[in-house]
Curated annotation (Swiss-Prot):
Keywords: Cell inner membrane, Cell membrane, Electron transport, Flavoprotein, FMN, Membrane, Phosphoprotein, Translocase, Transmembrane, Transmembrane helix, Transport. Belongs to the RnfG family. Its cofactor is FMN. This is Ion-translocating oxidoreductase complex subunit G. One of its GO terms (biological process) is electron transport chain. Pfam families: FMN_bind. One of its GO terms (cellular component) is plasma membrane. Part of a membrane-bound complex that couples electron transfer with translocation of ions across the membrane.
Amino acid sequence: MLKTIQKHGVTLAVFAALTTGLTAMVNALTKTTIEGQAALQQKQLFDQVLPPEMYDNDIQQSCYLVSAPALGRGEKQLWVARKGDTPVAVVMQATAPDGYSGAIQLLVGADFKGTVLGTRVTEHHETPGLGDKIETRISDWITGFAGQVIHGPNDTRWAVKKDGGQFDQFTGATITPRAVVNAVKRAGLYAQTLEPQLSTLPSCGENP
């Protein structure tokens, strides 16, 4: 009887060990797959705001942290694109705090000379059928920033047409596009100041 119990105990222990090992392996594989998918999605988003032919570094591994009012409250991430060893452009997280239904989160690509290379919305709560035209699945409005140059903070073209600028507003919704235009302009102006600061920026994940 005792031998039978001991035998069953050993069997259960082996089974438990195998199950634990298998679970750990599955979790590790799942984590790797999820991380890989997230990295792929991020790269696809970067390609929409920054032409891939502009740079040859692994931009996702060139991530830095900044606290800049021009990009919105709190700490933001930015990624530096390099050609050879020369910084040529940057992708920045930015926030338009004054959307109609709250903050609008953006990704803005820009060079260091005043040209916005692309913009995409990553999160918003704008009204369906009105403010949601900032999404590419609804409208191509957001693509109109690509190639636009900012000639300083007093460049009045960087406004919606209702305010005397060059960017269309939406029918029945001016607040949303105005907020995005202003946020992209601020981010583009900030990019013009960045190049001399790059060597001093903390890397993402770096301990303070």
